[in-house]
């Protein structure tokens, strides 16, 4: 399976709650850029799973509009603060897909990437807003992933 990790695009710093923080104009542009980059380069996930937090869901919707036949599902376990083991458990329900995109948060995605790569967290990179990281997995278990790429939106 090819697993794409997409950190949500830039969001406003303050709102009545963290769950309702929306994308800034720059964040909307970043999300469109990611979606176009995916389409242009054939990075087409079979399905997009997104955190229920507003900024992640907005990012996923925009990216999905840029990708042909992209379906996305709001996945409550992807909310900020998820644990890698919990994410793996949820991903097992989608293990029959060749590719999958998760849209979510930091430091959750760095923790998940480190867990899947079998790398200590201090040796893994920090995923920037609107960055796209791809991991190749032969199985959904710790330590078996291979990093394919990690690219920030400003380089897309």
Ranges and model annotations:
Residues 2-82, 89, 123, 127-129:
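Active-site-proximal alpha-helix that buttresses catalytic centers in soluble enzyme cores
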Residues 117-148, 153-156:
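Domain-level recognition of soluble alpha/beta enzyme cores
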Residues 92-102, 144-153:
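A polyampholytic, Gly/Pro-enriched intrinsically disordered region
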Residues 67-69, 97, 142:
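Short, well-ordered coil/turn elements that cap or connect secondary structure elements
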Residues 94-101, 106-131:
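Non-DNA-binding regulatory cores of transcription-related proteins
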Residues 9-10, 54, 78, 106-108, ...:
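Short, flexible active-site-adjacent loop segments at beta-strand->alpha-helix junctions, enriched
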Residues 37, 62, 66, 93, ...:
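Active-site catalytic microenvironments for nucleophilic, acid-base chemistry
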